[in-house]
C-alpha cells in the first residue's frame, strides 16, 4: 500500500500522534506527514504511506489557513495553549487600526518563530529548551505570505479578528498573531487555527479519523495516488531502454523529444515509462555543457 491520505487533523493531537494512529489503523510502519500542525490546530495534514514517504519533500509548499487573533493577551507559546504573561483590555482597538498595519505582513517578511516550536537550535528543538526553562536566541528567517485578508471582526475588551492567510512553508501563524499585537502595541495571541489547504490538499476533500475507520471497516478505504499529489511537477516519458538505465541510477543526456524547456534546469520532474508507469522523480542538472536527467527518487524497478 502506497499513496497519500488527506487527513483532517483533530484538535489535541500532535502531528506525530496522527502518524502513529495511521500506522496502527493501516498496520504499516512506513508512514510520515507533510508539514507539522500545532496540537491545538485542526485541518489538513498530508500523510504519506509506503514509498510515498520518500516523496514528501517534493510536495508543493503553499499552505492556507483560517486563524483567529485575540488582542490584549500575550502568552508564552503565542497561542492560548500557553501561560498568559500579560492581559490588559483594549476596548479602544478598532478594525481600521488592524487594516492599516496588515499590509506589513504581506510578501517576504522577517519572522522569529515562536520559542515553543519544533525548530532546532544547536541540535535541540526549541520547545524542549523552553520546557527546560532555557532561553536561547531564536534566529530570524524570511518567510513569504502570499495573501492575508480580514474575514470577521469582533470588538470588545479583548477583541478578535478572523484572518485568511495563504503562505509558503515555514510560516508560523502564531508568530503573525504575536507580531500583529506587537505592531499595534497591545499584544496579541492566536486563539484558533485551521489549515484549509496544504501542499495541494484541501480541507473539503479531507477525511477525519472516524471516516477513515468507517471506510476501513467497510473495505472502502483507499489512498490518493502519488501522481495526484505530484501533479504540479512536469512530466518526462522515457523509452524502455532509457527507463531501465535511469532506474538503475544512470544519468541520461537531455533529449529534444522530451519537449522540456531547458530553462527548467534544476527543476524536478515526474518520470514515466512508455507504459505509463510512474518511475520516480528526476532532476535536470547541468554537467559542463550538457543537461542530464538525474534520478532523485526511484520508486519503480
From Swiss-Prot:
Its job: Responsible for synthesis of pseudouridine from uracil-55 in the psi GC loop of transfer RNAs.
Cross-referenced InterPro entries: PsdUridine_synth_cat_dom_sf, PsdUridine_synth_N, tRNA_psdUridine_synth_TruB, tRNA_sdUridine_synth_fam1_C
Highest taxon of the lineage: Bacteria
Residues at the catalytic site: 38
Family: Belongs to the pseudouridine synthase TruB family. Type 1 subfamily.
GO terms for biological process, alphabetical: mRNA pseudouridine synthesis; tRNA pseudouridine synthesis
Source organism phylogeny: Bacteria, Bacillati, Cyanobacteriota, Cyanophyceae, Oscillatoriophycideae
Any GO molecular function: RNA binding
CDD domains membership: PseudoU_synth_EcTruB (cd02573)
E.C. numbers: 5.4.99.25
Catalytic activity: uridine(55) in tRNA = pseudouridine(55) in tRNA
SUPFAM superfamilies: Pseudouridine synthase
Keyword vocabulary terms for this entry: Isomerase, tRNA processing
Protein name: tRNA pseudouridine synthase B
